[in-house]
Amino acid sequence: MNEKRLFTEAQTENEAVDFTPKREFHGEMHIEKDEPVIEDRFVEQTFEHIVQPRSRWWKTGLALTALLFCFAVIAQSIQWLVDTWQQNQWIYFVFSLVTCLVVLLGVSSLGKEWLRLVKLKKRLSLQQKSQQILRESAVNLGQDFCAEKHQQIKALCTEMAQMLKLSSEDPGLIQWQNQLHDAYSAQEVAHLFSQTVLHPFDVQIKKLISKSALEAAVIVAVSPLAVIDMFFLSWRNIRLVNQIAQIYGIELGYWSRLRLLKMVLLNLAFAGATEVVQDIGLDWLSQDLTAKLSARAAQGIGVGLLTARLGIKAMEFCRPLAFQAGEKPRLNHIQQELLGQLRSTFFRSNKTKVKQQV
């Protein structure tokens, strides 16, 4: 049996009782939606590892071997030209002259391709350097450190303006220089440069992306042949990337164009469907496309959005300064334009068919 316990009045008064405070509930409660958590850091690190692999010794050796081979071919061509001239072998001299010219043209074209590829790599490294400066200045807020980062980002923005081939009398550049202040942080300097200098380029490219997406959507929705759609979209997408690079002052060659397309397509593959869901939202569920538009129109909308995503990714890589928070273009406005354009196109075609039948 349990033993008897005696309680005194002093013990009960000294014991502290832990009561739960009352909670009041109202009829209306605000529930915040949980944002989807995406492993952006892991995706970004993996993507950068693929796009910019570590330099290997065999690549350096292969480049040196190719360089020595080019010099050997040039030297042999010149030697052949001199020998045929000295020996009065005019037929061989003509052949050697043509060969020498072809070799020189080939080497010069390879040199131009290499320079364009170097400029593209320099543009990407400049963008990454600006990202690093902005990231470091956001973490460390010391006065001396902020002043140092202010000068660094200012020098980078000036170099970006030179890459864009802007003159010293450009209105946007002059406005940016006049609005600068020593008290501004690196983020404020970069944001000011983006809004004054890069804003006209961004607006032009956004219009180009919207136009290309609308054209691709209408062509796919109207065209009956899938083969024609495939070749048309391939040509249009490559042309879109070239136009975006040209607007941002990047001169693309063969290898630099391949490298840029590789980076854009890899980024599209790594981003996946989660980014599309974030950009578009759940508007698709409320619009009931299957009840209003045909399957072909839905295919056109999908192709148009993919074209827009391709243009936005190319814009991210070609833009000298990386997008900050809230500056990156989204697919919402392009989605609305696609829906309106396709709806008007299909409804117009249906009305004409009804009139013809009547």
UniProtKB/Swiss-Prot annotation:
Protein name stated in the entry: UPF0283 membrane protein PM0909
GO cellular component term, pick one: plasma membrane
Topology versus the membrane: Multi-pass membrane protein
Protein family per UniProt: Belongs to the UPF0283 family.
Main location: membrane
Annotated S-S bridges: none
Keyword set includes Magnesium: no
HAMAP family xrefs: UPF0283 (MF_01085)
UniProt subcellular location: Cell inner membrane
Protein's UniProt keywords contain Electron transport: no
Domain of life: Bacteria
One of the Pfam families matching this protein, by short name: DUF697
Spans traversing the lipid bilayer: 62-82, 90-110, 213-233
UniProtKB keywords: Cell inner membrane, Cell membrane, Membrane, Transmembrane, Transmembrane helix
